[in-house]
């Protein structure tokens, strides 16, 4: 333990379920996961963050109060994990904090992205150097600012799986794919991951998600609704591209439901699951693909995993745990790794993925 450089990663995504925290070392050929934890959002914070992500406007006090509450939860997650793992904070070189995205608009005339999280407060409450604000440098360089995890996906998997794709199914689904023949990598958001399924579960079944895909499995795919949703222009955009809750949200779902004859609640959920599966599979280049590794909450949706396998005959579809990375903490590990890259003054983006003008060192450093 004393010889290892340990980095922490904090990730809270568009699913708004809570904070994933990982402690990791990257000195070996494969990353070493030292400890992990999940800290759920209290209901009031979840409500505030959802409101900030979808509302057309809000008061500054709402924004900054929510940011402070969120940051204190981040600090609590770090401090509690260090205590439970019996690791002294002096051993942690830095925390890579993604923050909570409330807006991501890289394609407008004045492009921007906004992640809540006060790195100064986090450094103060943990006594650990914090690396934050990873996305804006890539946007400043003409990129999408997302996805950033592909560099980490390649780092941990490419040498073992030369013709492979990774899909992170959080609120939004994003793909990383590389092939030995093309000697190139692509990465992009391909559409909704769990975000619409979770929204419908909350509205129709009063639960936060479809555990294991058990409800969707009892429904039938409504092809009229599916085709209506697939008319969304985002799906036909060429990569690189990125999206978020500002597009795929409850209002988007309701607008599509209104264009379709009445559909049973379970059939709607089955159709939303199929939408995620089809838009992922249609975004992949299957010519040389041998493996699809799934991370994020979607890896636990067995019905969704079956639908992915159904659309990808001859391709092995597995959770990233089969490759040695816990699917629940892949993204937190990625931001711990990006923090390491920043401290080492190494680039963290892949221009072919984000469309940036070149490689850039990402993030800002907030010393302990």
Swiss-Prot record:
Q: Where does ATP bind?
A: 13-20
Stretches of the chain forming a coiled coil according to its record = none
Question: Which SUPFAM superfamilies does the record cross-reference, listed alphabetically?
Answer: Actin-like ATPase domain (SSF53067)
EC id? 2.7.1.170
Q: Which Pfam families match?
A: AnmK
Instruction: Describe which pathway this protein belongs to, using the record's wording.
Output: Amino-sugar metabolism; 1,6-anhydro-N-acetylmuramate degradation; Cell wall biogenesis; peptidoglycan recycling
One GO BP: 1,6-anhydro-N-acetyl-beta-muramic acid catabolic process
Question: Which superkingdom does the taxonomy of this entry point to?
Answer: Bacteria
Q: Which InterPro entries match?
A: Anhydro_N_Ac-Mur_kinase, ATPase_NBD
Keyword entries, A-Z = ATP-binding, Carbohydrate metabolism, Kinase, Nucleotide-binding, Transferase
Output the Gene Ontology terms for molecular function.
Answer: ATP binding; kinase activity; phosphotransferase activity, alcohol group as acceptor
EC class of the enzyme, as a word: transferase
Listed Gene3D superfamilies: 3.30.420.40
Q: What is catalyzed by this enzyme?
A: 1,6-anhydro-N-acetyl-beta-muramate + ATP + H2O = N-acetyl-D-muramate 6-phosphate + ADP + H(+)
| Family note | Belongs to the anhydro-N-acetylmuramic acid kinase family.
Biological role:
Catalyzes the specific phosphorylation of 1,6-anhydro-N-acetylmuramic acid (anhMurNAc) with the simultaneous cleavage of the 1,6-anhydro ring, generating MurNAc-6-P. Is required for the utilization of anhMurNAc either imported from the medium or derived from its own cell wall murein, and thus plays a role in cell wall recycling.
Stated name of the protein: Anhydro-N-acetylmuramic acid kinase
| Gene responsible for this protein | anmK
């Amino acid at each position: 333990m004393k010889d290892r450089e340990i980095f922490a990663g904090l990730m809270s995504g568009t699913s708004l379920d809570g904070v994933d925290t990982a402690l990791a070392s990257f000195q070996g050929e494969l990353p070493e996961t030292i400890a992990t934890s999940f800290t759920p959002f209290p209901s009031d914070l979840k409500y505030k963050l959802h409101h900030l992500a979808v509302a057309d406007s809000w008061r500054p006090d709402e924004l900054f109060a929510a940011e402070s509450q969120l940051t204190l939860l981040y600090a609590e997650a770090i401090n509690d994990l260090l205590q439970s793992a019996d690791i002294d904070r002096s051993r942690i070189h830095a925390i890579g904090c993604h923050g909570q995205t409330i807006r991501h608009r890289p394609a407008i005339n004045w492009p921007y992205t906004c992640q809540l999280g006060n790195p100064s407060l986090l450094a103060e409450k943990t006594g650990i150097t914090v690396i934050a604000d990873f996305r804006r440098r890539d946007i400043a360089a003409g990129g999408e600012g997302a996805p950033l995890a592909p560099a980490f996906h390649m780092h941990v998997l490419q040498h073992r799986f030369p013709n492979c794709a990774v899909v992170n199914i959080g609120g939004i689904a994003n793909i990383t794919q590389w092939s030995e023949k093309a000697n190139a990598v692509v990465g992009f958001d391909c559409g909704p991951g769990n975000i619409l399924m979770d929204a419908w579960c909350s509205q129709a079944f009063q639960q936060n998600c479809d555990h294991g895909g058990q409800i969707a499995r009892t429904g039938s795919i409504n092809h009229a609704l599916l085709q209506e949703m697939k008319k969304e222009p985002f799906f036909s955009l060429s990569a690189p591209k990125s999206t978020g809750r500002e597009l795929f949200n409850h209002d988007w779902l309701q607008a599509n439901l209104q264009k379709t004859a009445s559909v049973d609640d379970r059939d709607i959920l089955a159709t939303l699951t199929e939408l995620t599966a089809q838009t992922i599979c249609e975004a992949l280049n299957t010519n040389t693909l041998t493996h699809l590794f799934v991370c994020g909450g979607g890896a636990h949706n067995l019905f969704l995993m079956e639908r992915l396998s159904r659309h990808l005959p001859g391709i092995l579809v597995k959770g990233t745990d089969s490759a040695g990375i816990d699917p629940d903490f892949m993204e937190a590990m990625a931001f711990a790794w990006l923090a390491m890259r920043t401290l080492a003054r190494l680039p963290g983006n892949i221009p072919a993925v984000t469309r940036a003008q070149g490689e850039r060192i990402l993030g800002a450093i907030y010393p302990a």
